[in-house]
């Protein structure tokens, strides 16, 4: 059991005051290890809120550098960070918010050669990536490793998210394969309202904290979608498919696949 310092009691007092969280729940948060894949639009708010909450160890994977066009929605990066690796910029802000958080940075692409080795070090994975191939890679790696994860995607004025736990519906239960290259526009082609990234990212952060504290109902076997134009939120039931190629009773995928990177659903 963690012997809380006065500083920690004060820092996390609003969590500790919550009957459903308390000291025990905060201790679980502080012992948690979370991997955030992507330090862009979704990874930014996820990382900031998890750091503020006191997650003990946060890993960040991203091979990109900060671009001026990122600053409209990637709130973890500042103007001074343009040209800096996103993982370095994100680590600086996380440490500024909460110096007690251990940060692991992976300035590299997540692919079939490293995904399982990186993911195995963490208790929960957050998908904040910008393309379908990596989303499928994260899904498959997490299913193979038995790791829970939160999926997120944004485009224009819309967002979607769900949470996977072992035995529940996975990404392939909904979408069997990535769409053909060019079938779905990117945010650089179609645009995205900056605040949408914050809306969805904070939902993913909340799901992560709920997972570790055991509070409430997770978004398992259901896909949450929202349209910011109308502020309509919908929850669509999703079934675990016994015939799923990765999590079904007789899976046909036995290794990780690097799909063509041209098919994107969003840009960081």
Task: Pin down the residues of each PLM region.
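Adenine nucleotide-associated cytosolic modules
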Residues: 1-268
């Amino acid at each position: 059991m963690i012997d809380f310092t006065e500083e920690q009691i004060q820092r996390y007092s609003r969590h500790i005051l919550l009957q459903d969280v308390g000291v025990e729940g905060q201790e679980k948060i502080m012992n948690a290890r979370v991997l955030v894949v992507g330090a862009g639009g979704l990874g930014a708010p996820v990382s900031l809120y998890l750091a503020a909450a006191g997650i003990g160890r946060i890993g960040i994977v991203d091979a990109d550098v900060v671009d001026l066009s990122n600053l409209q929605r990637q709130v973890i990066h500042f103007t001074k960070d343009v040209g800096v690796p996103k993982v370095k910029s994100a680590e600086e802000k996380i440490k500024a918010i909460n110096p007690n958080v251990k940060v692991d940075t992976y300035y590299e692409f997540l692919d079939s050669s490293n995904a399982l080795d990186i993911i195995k070090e963490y208790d929960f994975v957050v998908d904040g990536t910008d393309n379908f191939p990596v989303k499928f890679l994260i899904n498959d790696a997490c299913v193979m490793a038995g790791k829970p994860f939160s999926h997120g995607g944004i485009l224009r004025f819309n967002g979607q998210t769900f949470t996977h736990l072992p035995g529940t519906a996975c990404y392939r239960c909904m979408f069997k394969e990535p769409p053909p290259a060019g079938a779905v526009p990117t945010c650089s082609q179609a645009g995205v309202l900056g605040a949408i990234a914050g809306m969805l990212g904070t939902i993913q952060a909340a799901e992560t904290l709920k997972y570790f504290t055991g509070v409430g109902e997770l978004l398992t076997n259901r896909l949450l979608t929202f349209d910011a134009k109308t502020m309509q939120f919908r929850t669509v039931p999703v079934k675990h498919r016994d015939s799923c190629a990765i999590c079904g009773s007789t899976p046909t995928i036995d290794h990780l696949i690097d799909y063509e990177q041209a098919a994107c659903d969003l840009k960081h």
